[in-house]
């Protein structure tokens, strides 16, 4: 008996071709995925470090993670964890960087790179709140979340307090000064927010808080002028005169003393962001950063 040849329908043929393609692709991906498997730890570290030096942060992070997964312990692994956190920071993955740093600090609390990791955590926390989010977060300047920059300040303070002789202490102090002035500017903008809404008691409260918490900041005399303005409207002549006397002695050219329209409220777009710009509400001039003691 003669057997008839078997013919595949177009649908069956397409299914066979598709299955073959998936099998080949899967094998290729598996080969690519496992390309670093079995590579000596020093070679894997060199590969990741080279990628990082070239600015390939994503590739470096992937290679460092593979090294850490394949070799959980050892000096190369410890250094890979440090550089992986840096690669994440440079990639803008600040939350991931902070998580990696926290894991390292918990695992190796006495490691010689601990000062650097606190410093890097400060840099990462400083950048967690993006400018875009600051602008669209809320119109109410008094309800912003300063937890990330405050944590950054604490990280830099840890470097300065615990490791004053480390190579990162000098810049940590500079970063603290910049953050401190930013916090003072935030308080000044909140004060202006209340002045603009004729909330005189609230404005005086925030101005006093600024002066007590951030003395000698670039915004101290604007805060004194805000006190004078608020107390004038509240009918407290004694306190208003005290504010005027302080300005006459220390900032005689302040616009509030000259009867000029003060304060000059930020433009509409800057009302969204208490950190926007570095200009004094009094003069419109850019303020210089002052050293904190």
Swiss-Prot record:
UniProt-listed PROSITE patterns: PROKAR_LIPOPROTEIN
Family per similarity comment: Belongs to the BamD family.
Organism: Xylella fastidiosa (strain Temecula1 / ATCC 700964)
GO BP term (any one): Gram-negative-bacterium-type cell outer membrane assembly
Keywords linked to the UniProt accession: Cell outer membrane, Lipoprotein, Membrane, Palmitate, Signal
UniProt membrane topology term: Lipid-anchor
GO cellular component annotations of the record: Bam protein complex
UniProt-annotated location(s): Cell outer membrane
Protein name as it appears in the record: Outer membrane protein assembly factor BamD
Lipid attachment points (S-diacylglycerol cysteine): 27
NCBIfam families per the UniProt record, alphabetical: OM_YfiO
Signal peptide range in chain numbering: 1-26
Primary localization class, coarse: membrane
Function according to Swiss-Prot or TrEMBL: Part of the outer membrane protein assembly complex, which is involved in assembly and insertion of beta-barrel proteins into the outer membrane.
InterPro entries per UniProt: BamD (IPR017689), BamD-like (IPR039565), TPR-like_helical_dom_sf (IPR011990)
Lipid sites, type N-palmitoyl cysteine: 27
Pfam families xrefs: YfiO
Taxonomic lineage of the native organism: Bacteria, Pseudomonadati, Pseudomonadota, Gammaproteobacteria, Lysobacterales
């Amino acid at each position: 008996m003669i057997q008839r040849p078997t013919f595949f329908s177009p649908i069956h043929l397409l299914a066979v071709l598709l299955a073959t393609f998936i099998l080949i692709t899967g094998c290729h991906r598996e080969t690519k995925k496992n390309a670093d498997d079995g590579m000596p730890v020093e070679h894997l570290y060199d590969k990741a470090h080279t990628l990082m030096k070239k600015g390939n942060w994503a590739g470096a992070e992937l290679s460092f993670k593979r090294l850490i997964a394949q070799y959980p312990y050892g000096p190369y692994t410890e250094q890979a964890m440090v550089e992986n956190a840096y690669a994440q920071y440079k990639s803008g993955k600040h939350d991931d960087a902070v998580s990696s740093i926290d894991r390292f600090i918990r695992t190796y609390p006495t490691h010689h790179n601990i000062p650097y990791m606190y410093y890097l955590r400060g840099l990462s926390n400083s950048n967690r709140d993006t400018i875009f989010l600051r602008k669209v977060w809320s119109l109410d300047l008094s309800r912003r979340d300063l937890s990330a920059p405050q944590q950054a300040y604490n990280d830099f303070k840890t470097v300065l307090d615990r490791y004053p002789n480390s190579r990162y202490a000098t810049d940590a102090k500079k970063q603290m000064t910049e953050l401190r002035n930013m916090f003072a500017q935030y308080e000044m903008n909140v004060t202006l927010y209340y002045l603009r809404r004729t909330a005189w008691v609230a404005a005086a409260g925030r101005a006093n808080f600024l002066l007590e918490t951030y003395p000698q900041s670039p915004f101290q005399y604007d805060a004194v002028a805000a006190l004078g303005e608020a107390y004038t409207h509240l009918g407290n002549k004694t306190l208003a005169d005290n504010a005027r006397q302080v300005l006459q002695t220390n900032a005689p050219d302040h616009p509030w003393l000259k009867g000029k329209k003060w304060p000059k409220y930020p433009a509409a777009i800057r009302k969204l962001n208490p950190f926007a710009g570095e200009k004094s509400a009094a003069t419109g001039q850019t303020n210089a950063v002052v050293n904190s003691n």
